[in-house]
Curated annotation (Swiss-Prot):
Protein name per its UniProtKB record: Retinoblastoma-associated protein
Location of region: Disordered: 1-31, 603-634, 873-921
Similarity comment text for this entry: Belongs to the retinoblastoma protein (RB) family.
Subunit note: Interacts with and sequesters the E2F1 transcription factor, thereby inhibiting E2F1 transcription. Interacts with SUV39H1, KMT5B and KMT5C.
Post-translational modification: Phosphorylated in G1, thereby releasing E2F1 which is then able to activate cell growth. Dephosphorylated at the late M phase. Phosphorylation of domain C promotes interaction between the C-terminal domain C and the Pocket domain, and thereby inhibits interactions with heterodimeric E2F/DP transcription factor complexes.
The organism's place on the tree of life at top rank: Eukaryota
Length: 921
């Protein structure tokens, strides 16, 4: 611990008010004289009001850090290192006597710099606990949301208010005061309405409510169009601008409830927000918030000091970020240069004066609104009741499932609404109900598609068994709701469609419906197959959910998976062999459906297969053998498919980590994979309440150990943290035995090695075990095809998926190189620019025609139009002609396009002549 100073060096250094409001505690005891650095540490602790327990442990943490390899970096940043140590210890001991902003101010660093330095400390020492990880993750998400919202707030206010309003406007209503009032009111509303403050969508909708409220209170002379006209109309009608000093705010709030919605409609239209959703937030959350404030207005605006004082109480209670400092552009809240380059930005409109327009990524708020719009487009034709087609399917069942389906949807709706309000905020219950209805619409839509698909596949109409399966319906509804929750749960830092964690993130929906992850997994692939309108981000999210289930969620103690494995062993009378290794290098078939997986019981060995199909759908486990009626019982389809997918995911994870660590030892990969695969297949109990990656890292370490390859666990962990979709809890908190957790190293020594010691030692002998085949790794079945697709109806039009204007290999914001193919692009729905671009196209076409010698057409009738191939020179030309060898591919393309256009025009002319002739007759 640091020795006690002769005098308290930092007692008067800071006058900040702590949440406790008391003086700092005494310095830790000691008798030696302080050095300069130690005195500064004590001064920092004094400034933060750190108690003795935090000071002592923080100093010990710093000493451990300073004694480690590469400690010179920390010696150069002593103060920052002390701050990180104090922060870590205060969280671990639950003795936070300072706010996060106070810590940043004391260290004179920004949020981004602090997080980056904390990450560096963790890389070298692994001293950051999962509790600290969780706190840091929450702070990051809150900061990202606040930063995105403040940037949006600034830009929006610039579009609403005049920079220099007329002189008749009171100085008290200056733009600075208005902005401050807006922002603090929003922060207070956000803090009081939302328990889950990293919800970007509801936060933005709440911001629009605040904007609507203040715009109506603003003099029209301050406003730009169309807000000026909207407020003027309200003023003329006498529905607003009534409050003055001393008038009760509750009356003002209630006065505005029934006013014209023109302003909120404009705001929603400008920001592509759903009007009904914003109104819902306004009336169920924002109005109750206003009524709870009891603030007296001054010139139509609440007193800033009163609002600020209320927010201060909230900020000190949470001990996190003082978001009022965004108004001052405080350095602690400014993103670093690197972080700025990674922020998404709104695409610019095409500028006719610019030669080339690069489309930049979107802002977080714009991206969130767009994903919601995409979901609404999918659900445009869907209803929250079963369609006539679904009812017909229900009526065809032996036992009509309609009543049970409707009752289930209603009861689960009440549960969802309650749990949503508990997670987000009690004032948001109606928002949860609104989102549940969207999920129900998607649920019925996908159910109908599934039944149509099964009907075509099996030529049956009676799906009684499937439609009366409670787990199937709950899983299907949960999957539909997960799509909705992921769409609305997009976070400010989520730019690539991947799933960023929030309180409502998967597997939240499983906990709400008390649904097992293994049961939910069964519906995912079929859900994606039968709903072609799902966006790429939605599909990637569901794929990530499937991966999480295979990695850990399906291996929880109460999972049905272990029952299936046990029954599989008993049925086959052998060691746990859910999937033979001989199938690993075979392609994974995707011809199964959700019905196959939900209706695939593990059959008793004594039963004979029946040749009569059951009502509902065919059961792949109940198909009779071609050679004998008494067939050997087959494995559960769901278990077999699950293991096939797990093996392929496991190998992909292993291969990625292996490439980072052991690329110079390629002979070790098949050995590590064999041990890894053997453990998953034959020692499945090691996976109980654990993670796939824990077994992977232990397998890698074990093989390197017996092969005398120097690879430390610390090195494995450091590389593992750089992999996508990883969590530090995976290696910091591993189950050792019941209710006891420790690090991955302890797990290896006490559990993994004890169980597999004999097997691992075989790899050091001259006769190692037979190597497991490398799994056949196909392209994900959920990926969209990148090949152009022809539009039906006979038009010679091809549509290719939008290519990203940036390549990660060239840097984050490095535009792709323009090619002849992409040099001039026309985006439907956007202004193409000046007529000069069309003239350039015509000129290029004319120039190419003068150099191209086309072969004569054999007949007047046009040939069938083939899909053009531009990749192989001189091959499969549209008209069968050959190009000159000196022509560029671009000229060839233009020639082919010209030829196609000529034939189409000729065909159109001939058709017109034929029509005229017929009319004359």
């Amino acid at each position: 611990m640091p020795p006690k100073p002769l005098r308290r060096a930092g007692a008067a250094r800071s006058q900040r008010t702590s949440p406790e409001g008391g003086a700092g505690t005494a310095s830790p005891p000691g008798g030696t004289r302080l050095e300069v650095g130690e005195a500064e540490f004590v001064a920092l602790c004094d400034a933060l009001k750190a108690p003795d327990s935090v000071r002592e442990k923080a100093w010990m943490t710093y000493q451990s850090l300073a004694a480690a390899d590469g400690a010179s970096a920390y010696n150069k940043k002593k103060k920052e290192t002390w701050g990180v140590c104090i922060f870590i210890v205060a969280i671990d001991l639950d003795e936070m006597t300072f706010t996060f902003t106070e810590l940043l101010k004391s260290l004179s660093i920004s949020v981004c710099t602090f997080f980056q330095f904390l990450k560096e400390v963790d890389v070298n020492m692994d001293t950051v606990s999962t509790k600290v990880d969780s706190t840091v993750s929450r702070l990051k998400k809150k900061y990202d949301v606040l930063l995105a919202l403040y940037h949006k707030f600034e830009r929006t206010c610039g579009l609403i208010y005049l920079e220099q309003p007329s002189s008749e406007i009171s100085a008290e209503l200056s733009s600075v005061l208005v902005l401050k009032n807006y922002w603090i009111t929003f922060l207070l509303a956000k803090g009081k309405v939302l328990q889950m403050e990293d919800d970007l969508v509801i936060s933005f909708q709440l911001l629009l409510c605040v904007l609507d409220y203040f715009i109506k209170l603003s003099p029209p002379a301050m406003l730009k169009e169309p807000y000026k006209s909207a407020v003027t109309a309200l003023t003329v009608n006498g529905s607003t601008r009534t409050p003055r000093r001393g008038q009760n705010r509750n009356a003002r709030a209630s006065k505005q409830i029934d006013t014209d919605t023109k302003v909120i409609e404009i705001l929603c239209k400008e920001h592509d927000c759903n009007l009904d959703e914003v109104k819902n937030v306004y009336f169920t959350s924002f109005i109750p918030f206003l009524n709870s404030l009891g603030v007296v207005a001054s010139n139509g605006l609440p007193e800033v000091d009163v609002l600020s004082k209320q927010y201060d109480e909230l900020y000190l209670k949470n001990k996190d970020i003082d978001a009022r400092l965004f108004l001052d552009h405080d350095e602690t809240l400014q993103p670093d240069v690197i972080a700025c380059s990674q922020l998404e930005r709104t695409p610019r409109k095409n500028n006719p004066d610019e030669e080339v327009n690069h489309v930049l990524p979107q802002t977080p708020v714009r991206a969130a609104m767009n994903t919601i719009q995409q979901l609404m487009m999918i659900l445009n034709s869907a209803t929250d009741k079963p369609s006539d087609t679904l009812i017909a399917y229900f009526n065809n069942c032996t036992v009509n499932p309609e009543d049970s389906i409707l009752k289930r949807v209603e009861s689960l709706g009440h549960i969802f609404k309650k749990k949503f309000a508990e997670a987000v905020g009690q004032g948001c219950a109606e928002i949860g109900s609104q989102r549940y209805q969207l999920g129900v619409r998607l649920y019925y839509r996908v159910m109908e598609s599934m039944l149509k698909s099964e009907e075509e596949r099996l030529s049956v109409h009676n799906f009684s068994k499937l439609l009366n399966d409670n787990i199937f319906h709950t899983s299907l509804l949960a999957c539909a709701l997960e799509i909705v929750m992921a769409t609305y749960g997009r976070t400010a830092s989520q730019s690539d469609g991947t799933s960023a964690e929030t309180d409502l993130s998967f597997p939240w929906i499983l906990n709400v419906f008390d649904l097992k992850a293994f049961d939910f997994y069964k519906v995912i692939e079929s859900f994606i197959k039968v709903e072609p309108s799902l966006t790429r981000d939605m599909i990637k999210h569901l794929e990530r959910c499937e991966h999480r289930i295979m990695e850990s969620l399906a291996w929880q103690s109460d999972s049905p998976l272990f029952d299936l494995i046990k029954q599989s062993k008993e049925r086959e009378g052998q060691t746990d062999q859910p999937e033979p290794t001989s199938t690993l290098n075979l392609p994974l078939q995707h011809n199964h459906t959700a019905a196959d997986l939900y209706l695939s019981p593990v059959r008793s060995p004594k039963k004979k297969a029946s040749g009569h199909p059951q009502s509902g759908t065919s059961n792949p486990d109940a198909q009779p053998s071609a050679t004998s009626q008494t067939q050997k019982p087959q494995k559960s389809t769901s278990l077999s498919l699950f293991y096939k997918k797990v093996f392929r995911l496991a190998y992909l994870r292993l291969h990625t980590l292996f490439f980072r660590l052991l690329s110079e030892h390629p002979d070790l990969e098949p050995l590590i994979w064999t041990l890894f695969q053997h453990t998953l297949q034959n020692e499945s109990e090691l996976m109980r309440d654990r993670h796939l990656d824990q077994i992977m890292m232990c397998s890698m370490y074990g093989i390197c150990k017996v092969k005398n390859v120097d690879l430390r666990f610390k090195t494995i962990v450091s590389a593992y943290k750089e992999l996508p979709n990883t969590n530090q809890e995976t290696f910091k908190r591993v189950l050792i035995r019941e209710e006891q957790y420790d690090s991955i190293i302890v797990f290896y020594n006490l559990v993994f090695m004890q169980k597999l010691k004999t097997n691992i030692l075989q790899y050091a002998s001259n006769r190692p075990p037979t190597l497991s085949p490398i799994p056949h790794i196909p392209r994900s079945p959920y990926q969209f095809s990148n090949s152009p697709r022809r539009v039906p109806a006979g038009n010679n039009i091809y549509i290719s998926p939008l290519k990203s204007p940036y390549k990660f290999s060239d840097g984050f914001h490095s535009p792709t190189k323009m090619t002849p193919r992409s040099r001039i692009l026309v985006s439907i729905g956007e202004t193409f620019g000046t007529s000069e671009k069309f003239q350039k196209i015509n000129q290029m076409v004319c120039n190419s025609e003068s150099h191209v010698k086309r072969s004569a057409e054999p007949s007047d009738a046009p040939k069938p139009l083939k899909r053009l191939r531009f990749d192989i020179e001189g091959q499969d030309e549209a008209d069968g002609g050959k190009h000159l060898p000196q022509e560029s591919k671009f000229q060839q393309k233009l020639a082919e396009m010209t030829s196609t256009r000529t034939r189409m025009q000729k065909q159109k002319l001939n058709d017109g002549n034929d029509t005229s002739a017929n009319e004359e007759k």
